[in-house]
Amino acid sequence: MAAKEVRFHDNARERIVNGVNVLADAVKVTLGPKGRNVLLARSFGAPHITKDGVSVAKEIELKDPFENMGAQMVKEVASKTADVAGDGTTTATVLAQAIVQEGMKYVASGMNPMDLKRGIDKAVHAVIKELQTLSKPVTNSKETAQVAALSANSDEAIGKIIADAMDKVGKEGVITVEDGKSLDNELAVVEGMQFDRGYLSPYFITDPEKQTAVLEDPLVLLYDKKISNIRDLLPVLEQVAKAGKPLLIVAEDVEGEALATLVVNSMRGILKVAAVKAPGFGDRRKAMLEDIAILTGGTVIAEETGLTLEKAGLAELGSAKRVEIGKENTTIIDGAGDKAKIDARVQAIRAQIDAATSDYDREKLQERVAKLSGGVAVIRIGAATEVEMKEKKDRVDDALHATRAAVEEGIVAGGGVALLRARAHIKELKGDNPDQDAGIQIVLRALEAPLRAIAANAGDEPSVIVNKVLEGKGNHGYNAASGQFGDLVEMGVIDPTKVTRTALQNAASIASLILTTDATVAEAGQDSKAKAPAELDY
């Protein structure tokens, strides 16, 4: 086991604070509408330019192990805020730094760190309560666009495209971000249910120009096993041919003789048919087949339910208004399923989302809800270069998360003003002893930090701006983008309540842990004057 170096008291805390400051100062420059970019080197490829606080924080590793501990703890603030709220990472980092810096003064003067922590917790709890009082719900598309634009570094085009996407797929809909092929951002909305499986044979194509197979008013056969023997399929094929309707087959796979027969029948015009593989794998495949069954009003033919392919009839088949099958995707539009059953299925999946422990599972379940209820919107990012596209994508992701947070918990005035207004309401707050009172004072001062950083990045004097904002009331604040004072909500400078709340909670949590640290242990540094390798004789 490697030797360890142990540091105590001020010696330990000082190095931690140095690490906190290095990381926070690098992240802080990105805050506000006039915040700057940070250039991140890559071991291969072009450097990455970003204005996203958590992306900057994740890149930072310090050489000194004690300083690195401080940096990693603040990195945790940014990461946790990004995970929960999706935005506000820079605000959280700035607040954490402010609480640590203020708190260290009191710790150095001999106050009890545990009581300081209790005071900090009391103040944060009171501020969050006040933020919830100040919060108002998002009522229209304009406010949605304003939240998104502000989070995307005041980019109104991004704000508008996100608001449009939300209007089209609803609050529960899935919005994905992809690389575009042009210079402009594009929004594509997939209505109906789309899954990532295409036709099993190009001979099913009905539109050679678009390379798609289109079935109008088809019946839908759902089977959870492979189909390789045409004899199993014949009874149902004959019934479909008599009904004079096209047929979509969704199965684990269709191969060999069965696929060849379907292709021949399709090409001769005897039966308009197309076959695709079922989406997903394992249990997820079964669940998605069941989703398609409910959406189309059909039944999954599976041995568990006592149904076999040979005995299947028209009663087991679902139907839809239209099915479009491409090389890689299948879209079922306007399925004939019972609305009450679809709603019940959506509620059941939502219950699974609440119980899910993994982010991946939660994301996949949310996709299923969207496919059943609203549809999927795809935002394609346009840019001239790959570096610009990555930077834009970062901002769109931030804006998307901020917008969802705003829809969830409402909005407050942005620009650090909500925290200052909440501060005014807790000035009279008292702790159980003078040390707890000092903890409350730490938070009161730290709440100014985001506005100070925004003003400093805009080239203004922070103290002057803070005092002018404090002279006003309600949503009156400083719009750093225009350099004007006024009602920030009317100006469209708004933050999601969830983002502001999460930023403060996480910042206070980590900062108070740093204040209560009295010893640090890290691997002892290696001798910097290590012997140079001996020169070789030639």
From Swiss-Prot:
Protein keywords: ATP-binding, Chaperone, Cytoplasm, Isomerase, Nucleotide-binding
Reactions catalysed according to its record: ATP + H2O + a folded polypeptide = ADP + phosphate + an unfolded polypeptide
Top EC class of this enzyme: isomerase
InterPro entries in the cross-refs: Chaperonin_Cpn60_CS, Cpn60/GroEL, Cpn60/GroEL/TCP-1, GroEL-like_apical_dom_sf, GROEL-like_equatorial_sf, TCP-1-like_intermed_sf
The protein's Enzyme Commission number: 5.6.1.7
GO biological process terms held by the UniProt record: protein refolding
Keyword Nucleotide-binding assigned: yes
Family annotation (Pfam families): Cpn60_TCP1 (PF00118)
Domain of life where this protein originates: Bacteria
Subcellular location: Cytoplasm
Positions with a binding annotation for ATP: 30-33, 51, 87-91, 415, 479-481, 495
Gene Ontology MF terms in the entry: ATP binding; ATP-dependent protein folding chaperone; isomerase activity; unfolded protein binding
A GO-annotated cellular component: cytoplasm
Keyword Chaperone: yes
Bridged cysteine pairs (disulfide): none
Entries under HAMAP family matching the protein: CH60
Quaternary structure note: Forms a cylinder of 14 subunits composed of two heptameric rings stacked back-to-back. Interacts with the co-chaperonin GroES.
NCBIfam families tied to this protein: GroEL, PRK00013.1, PRK12849.1, PRK12850.1, PRK12851.1
PANTHER family: 60 KDA HEAT SHOCK PROTEIN, MITOCHONDRIAL (PTHR45633)
Biological role stated in the UniProt entry: Together with its co-chaperonin GroES, plays an essential role in assisting protein folding. The GroEL-GroES system forms a nano-cage that allows encapsulation of the non-native substrate proteins and provides a physical environment optimized to promote and accelerate protein folding.
Sequence similarity: Belongs to the chaperonin (HSP60) family.
The protein's name in its UniProt record: Chaperonin GroEL 1
Organism: Chromobacterium violaceum (strain ATCC 12472 / DSM 30191 / JCM 1249 / CCUG 213 / NBRC 12614 / NCIMB 9131 / NCTC 9757 / MK)
Gene name in the database record: groEL1
